[in-house]
Regions:
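Acidic/Gly/His-enriched mid-domain segments of enzyme catalytic cores or analogous surface patches
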Residues: 106-108
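Nucleic-acid enzyme cleavage-core boundary/entry regions
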Residues: 1-98, 110, 116-194
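Terminal peptide-recognition signature
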Residues: 103
């Protein structure tokens, strides 16, 4: 298997198997936590899974680990990602097209931009998961980057289904309670983790 460094890998939890041109496979199903290199994903011809859905999660250090721990039935393939890396794009390309994809990200402008970028490179529809703008108890003003990004997000056809959430943030001038971690730990019973 390839060496892992920087953004040249994808981190995941759940059943996954790489299929190579020579007919060989590498099954990661029994492992709880997996890093797969972009080089290995590029070499394989397809990726199979017995999971019923794919859930990509923006926050690798906390939220991803909490949801992986709650995924006891392993019916969800959980992948840590923010902006789509080459390894994540390879994984998306090689997973079955019929596998439903959900993305759980922060709800500040950068979080919505990540959802947009994932949708731009994904061969399947990506549904937002738990991504609802919530006003902050103490408003967090939009910064210069946010204000530059908002018009692009509001105009993006790929974000039409979440435009109301982005508009609420823009109208209030408030980034809101945007961090995933403020929603608390997921329910241990598995999908939908609530």
């Amino acid at each position: 298997m390839g060496l892992v460094a920087g953004d040249s890998h994808v981190e995941l939890h759940g059943p996954v198997c790489l299929h190579f041109p020579d007919g060989g496979t590498h099954d990661f199903d029994g492992l709880a936590h997996v890093l797969i290199s972009a080089a290995d994903l590029a070499r394989c011809v397809s990726v199979s899974t017995t999971a019923e859905r794919l859930l990509s999660i923006e926050n690798r250090k906390t939220t991803f680990r909490q949801y992986a721990a709650a995924n006891g039935d392993r019916r969800t393939l959980i992948v840590a990602t923010s902006f789509p890396t080459p390894a994540f794009r390879e994984l998306l390309e090689k997973l079955p097209r019929g596998l439903p994809h959900y993305h759980f990200g922060d709800t500040d402008p950068a979080g919505w931009q990540i959802l947009l970028k994932i949708r731009e490179v994904n061969p399947r529809r990506v549904e937002p998961f738990g991504m609802r703008w919530r006003p902050a108890a103490v408003p967090v003003p939009l910064n210069r980057f946010d204000l530059q990004l908002l018009p692009k997000l509001l105009d993006a056809p790929l974000l039409a289904d979440v435009r109301q959430e982005i508009s609420a943030m823009a109208a209030g001038g408030d980034r809101g309670d945007f961090e995933q971690e403020t929603l608390g730990r997921p329910a241990i019973e598995g999908w939908p983790f609530q």
